[in-house]
Amino acid sequence: MYSFIECIAGALFVLGCVVVTLVVIGVRALLYNFRNRPAPPLSSQLGQNAPHVTIIRPVKGLEPRLYDCIAASFRQDYPQDKVSIRLCLEDDTDPAYPVLQKVIEDFPTIDARIMLEKEDHVLSETVNMGPNPKIRNLSRAYREAKGDIVWIIDCNIWMAKGVLGRMVDKLMGYRVGGAAKPYKFVHQLPIVVDLMDFSTSLAAEGRSLLDASPEEDHPTEDLGAEEFPKVMSHGGGRIDEMFMTTSHAKFYSAINTLRAAPCAVGKSNMFRKSQLDQATDAILNPKLDQSKNLPTGVDYFSHNICEDHLIGEALWTTDFPGYKSHGLVWGDIAVQPVSGMSVQAYTARRSRWLRARKYTVLSATILEPFTECFLFATYMSLAMTTIPVLSQNLGIPKTWNATAIAWFTITTLWMLIDYIGYLRLHSGVTMEVDEHTPYFAKGFKNTGGIKRRPFLEFLAAWIGREGLAFPVWAYAVVFGNTVNWRGRLFYIHWDTTVDAVEPREERTREVRTPELERGPSRNKHRVD
């Protein structure tokens, strides 16, 4: 008869085996699918037969390399008359407005417009429109989209020139040798690239965001004696880079390989407007509650947080015969440059993300700490040195020394696996490089790309990220139900709907994230 502690150890060991399985699937998917440059897209060669795509880019404030990121939409290898680009802002006082004007001036032959939320008169007349700032920002662009295919990309994302064509190929089912089954929703794997070089100063951050600049934007001055304070004030980008390229990348890849559940982070998503309209129409979709009287399309999610996840989930759960649910476009990476993000800003951003996820995918959020290295190594090492069958058959002693050895062994193996995946995603081996590719997107294996991170620099960021994982999770999930979102504070309900908190109410809310409550300013306090 097993004791209670042995039963708990057995349950944790089983959970650990599930986590190991996911890690193996995810890492294998990364190494296999990001080993070569993707083939040229087929849809780009269709001319007038290519489906029309409306690219929608919601913008809020200045971002590092904003010009490069927005201009990437204009440089796609796709028939120009089959692309419309809509850049969405709240109003023309946003500091990003001149950057968007410059991009449009530089590409006069492309159908591109800046759409201001304050000029959207239909928005105020929409019945039961909610407060979600991102949805309100892009509502008009979605409503007036040309053609059926919509590609929504965050303003701080850069993508290679062939991505549009390959995403259309995946969505439509185009492939060499015949048609494949089309998808309802396709998306990219996102990574973060920190522009900060900790062997030099912060000169790059002070340079103009209008520059399309490559290599000359590398910082040049020595950090000197103030290295530690500057690491704290600018090291959040490296920790965010670590999270997105290790933990997030491998589990994102695993879940999308298994296709067990909708898993899309929302940086770069493509779908059909007609299908989302049907999925959100209570008359056409019997699964919806007609009494709510919500608008259709993206406006349906204007009362919710995590709108990107919910859009993907709506298409996942709505039956469209002949279509697969979600498809990750392997090989193409959505690159997000960051610069000058403090460690506090990183923890605040992760807290916001986790707090939002708590209300949309509660079970996954509760289990998340068990997939983080330090906690995983702790419960697995304890389980391995507690379960009798392992002691009897494998000779693992039930001692604290054995537990410590197991912990360090597991942690080291986990770190090395993360390092391999990190190198693959930052190498640039799958990147289409041309004269317009910015240095941060080239990877360290291409000429003029980012520097390869020294191993000790990787290790320091990895330890920092893993060490912060549980405290940030506990703060976000346990201690609060408000988030700051695009400069406004919102209270989240358990049905994922949100209420904007008036300034006089803010003091009564439980927990706030001060780094997120400042105005938009490049990346240091970026929260979107």
From Swiss-Prot:
Any one Gene Ontology BP term: glucosylceramide biosynthetic process
| Cell location | Golgi apparatus membrane
Query: What if the gene is knocked out?
Result: Results in complete loss of glucosylceramides (GluCers) in mutant cells. Shows a significant change in the conidial morphology and displays a dramatic polar growth defect, and its mycelia are resistant to cell wall degrading enzymes. Shows increased resistance to plant defensins MsDef1 and RsAFP2, but not MsDef4.
Q: Where is this region: Disordered?
A: 503-528
Gene3D superfamilies annotated for this entry? Spore Coat Polysaccharide Biosynthesis Protein SpsA, Chain A (3.90.550.10)
Principal place of residence: Golgi
Reaction(s) the record says it catalyses: an N-acylsphing-4-enine + UDP-alpha-D-glucose = a beta-D-glucosyl-(1<->1')-N-acylsphing-4-enine + UDP + H(+)
Give TM regions: 7-27, 370-390, 403-423, 458-478
Q: Mind listing the GO molecular function terms for this protein? A: ceramide glucosyltransferase activity
Motif D2 per UniProt: ranges: 154
EC numbers listed for it are 2.4.1.80
Keywords tagged on the record: Glycosyltransferase, Golgi apparatus, Lipid metabolism, Membrane, Sphingolipid metabolism, Transferase, Transmembrane, Transmembrane helix
Active-site positions on this chain: 308 (proton acceptor)
Please state what class of enzyme this protein is: transferase
> Per the entry's comment, what about the domains?
The D1, D2, D3, (Q/R)XXRW motif is a critical part of the GCS active site, involved in catalysis and UDP-sugar binding.
The family line of this record is: Belongs to the glycosyltransferase 2 family.
What name does this protein carry? Ceramide glucosyltransferase
Please spell out the taxonomic lineage of the organism that makes this protein. Eukaryota, Fungi, Dikarya, Ascomycota, Pezizomycotina
